[in-house]
């Protein structure tokens, strides 16, 4: 019993000593790590900005941006916005902060920063550029046509606002081109849904989506494709009167389409048939 007590006491003593050794090691490790971290932070903020004017600090931050040091530039612009909220350089800082977020591919954040400038500083010289970059942010967020297209729609909305408010801006042509590109993507999504419904024999739903493409996205490549498939579907369903109406619209609206000759031939044949009183409707 005595030996057991002695051994147990020795064991517990060793455990306690080991615990204090670990504690001492961790304390030393924490102090070393803290010192190392402070050293890094000290080096990263070694530039003394305390004697610089607001304009000089802005110039320094812009220089960081131009040198593509977007992380440090972003920190500087945020600091300027916090420290000098009523200064004349606020819109500069706000705009470049948005640009930093955009260059870092933080597109949701860049959209937020550009929106703040447009909303809070409507008289700023940066509003036109901010409006374009807001649209660009949503454009970058626009996914493949198979996915949800909310950002595509937001991008179209913001590009259109840019075109409407700044019609003489040199970037209007680019904005219009991207509106067309995004509309094409939206049309492709609707068209693909129509095709899926058609393959599943949900003809009413399919026709509805084909009509939507023609009506809403009439200036995209998917409009004549949708009308063509609608005509073929109506003919397959023996709805000849309706098919003829669509054929008439097709040859009037899409004379340059690759399917024009086929549809014109079908139209002529169907007209002759219906005039002879052989309509199946």
Task: Please provide the spans of the model-predicted regions.
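Acidic, polar-rich low-complexity tracts and alpha-helical solenoid repeat scaffolds
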Residues: 13-14, 31-32, 42-281
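Sec-dependent bacterial lipoprotein signal peptides
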Residues: 3-43
């Amino acid at each position: 019993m005595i030996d057991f007590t002695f051994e147990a006491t020795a064991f517990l003593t060793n455990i306690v000593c080991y615990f204090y050794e670990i504690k001492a090691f961790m304390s030393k490790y924490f102090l070393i790590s803290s010192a190392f971290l402070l050293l890094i932070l000290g080096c990263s903020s070694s530039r003394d900005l305390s004697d610089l004017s607001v304009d000089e600090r802005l110039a320094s931050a812009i220089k960081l941006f131009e040198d593509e040091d977007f992380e440090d530039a972003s920190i500087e612009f945020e600091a300027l916005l916090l420290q000098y909220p009523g200064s004349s350089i606020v819109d500069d800082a706000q705009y470049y902060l948005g640009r930093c977020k955009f260059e870092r591919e933080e597109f949701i954040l860049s959209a937020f920063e550009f929106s703040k400038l447009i909303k809070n500083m409507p008289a700023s010289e940066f509003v036109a550029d901010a409006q374009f970059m807001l649209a660009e942010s949503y454009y970058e967020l626009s996914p493949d046509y198979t996915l949800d297209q909310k950002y595509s729609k937001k991008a179209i909305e913001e590009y259109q606002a840019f075109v409407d408010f700044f019609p003489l801006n040199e970037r209007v042509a680019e904005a219009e081109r991207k509106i067309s590109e995004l509309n094409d993507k939206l049309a492709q999504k609707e068209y693909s849904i129509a095709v899926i419904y058609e393959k599943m024999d949900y003809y009413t739903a399919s026709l509805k989506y084909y009509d939507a493409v023609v009506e809403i996205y009439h200036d995209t490549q998917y409009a004549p494709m949708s009308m063509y498939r609608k005509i073929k579907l109506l003919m397959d369903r023996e709805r000849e009167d309706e098919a003829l109406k669509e054929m008439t619209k097709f040859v009037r609206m899409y004379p340059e389409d690759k399917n024009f000759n086929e549809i014109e031939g079908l139209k002529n044949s169907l007209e002759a048939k219906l005039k002879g009183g052989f309509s199946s409707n």
